[in-house]
Amino acid sequence: LKNFLKKNQKKIIKELDIFYSKYSKNKIITITGTNGKSTTAKLLDLILKDHKKDSRLCGNIGNPILSQKKISKNTLFVVEASSYQIAYSKFFKTNYAVILNISPDHLERHGSIENYVSAKFKLITNQSKKDFAFLNSKDRYLKNKIKKSKFFSRLINVNPKLTNSFNKKVVNPYFLSQGNRENLSFIFSISKKLKLKENKILKIINKFKGLKYRQQIIYNSNKITLINDSKATTFASTMNILKVLKKVYWLVGGIGKLGDKFTLKKNECKNIKAYVFGKNKNFFIKKFKNKISYYCFKDLNTALKQVLKEINNSRDNLHRTVLFSPAAASFDSFKNFEERGKHFNFLLKKY
């Protein structure tokens, strides 16, 4: 079967192509990027629904793209697309292409960072003159790709920093990290192009509870905050939140990603203690390069037990944060990041 599929690769049509063949006349907004795809797609879908739009959230977020029902000419689709889905598609096109960010990921599958960027950028090269592409042109990986590529869509450069007026109006603690704030910049940019109302956008943003296992606040008190960020499978997805937290007990471990780098400076790590668990501890220790205090444990259970013991024994009144953000794939011990996230919540209840 493997040889047959390889030999007939060009004849195989993927789900994005079948979807496009059915709904090419509908408006399609496709969101990709290394981090923040699901959160951004979900938030945009909620905003559109609040504007009484017949919005359908589908794709890699878990709602099968081909199982949508009762579609009318006014239906618009918010599609979360992975690099694999885009790379293997043949003629899929989107009216609005959104590339949130790029950092090294899935290089085992794509072979190189260049191939990975090309897979994402295919969303834009497949567009026509009537279409729009949203990206941060200062992104280190996209900058060169823009210069070297031929594309026809209208490029909208998104400033990753929110304007002061919007910053003051976003009071939801879920958007504390730099990464989540940058994703909001895309939300505002897309919403502006779609002529959506600012007051309604802000209402949804400030009510947004976040998605499971994505910087999800499990418990919060004056003494301690517990965050389940099991979805974090790279350093890039974890570092944004590490930068804004104080007195952090960071639970990290799993299968490290090829090409991944821990780029925080030593002075940015002074409030962080890393509790490294699992079989691949050396991967993380080498990446830390003595910039961070770390302790090693055989598994998540023993690491969490030690963290909670230290916090319970602390004599000061300083607020502490337990951050479960593995910065690695889960397949060494779990089926996927969801199972890993559920296990962490189970352990919290146990202790």
Stretches found by the model and what they are:
Residues 71-175, 332-338, 344:
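Flexible active-site lid/hinge loop adjacent to a nucleotide/diphosphate
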Residues 260-320:
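C-terminal helical cap/extension that packs against the catalytic core
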Residues 1-30, 51, 212-216, 300-311:
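Short, basic phosphate-binding NTP loop
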Residues 54, 173-271:
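Nucleotide phosphate-binding/pyrophosphate-handling subdomain across enzymes
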Residues 12, 31, 60, 100, ...:
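Residue-level signal for inorganic ion chemistry
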Residues 53-65:
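Short beta-strand-centered segment that lines the nucleotide-binding/catalytic pocket of NTP-utilizing
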Residues 39-56:
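A conserved segment at the C-terminal end of the G1
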Residues 133-137, 251-253, 270-279:
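Short internal beta-strands
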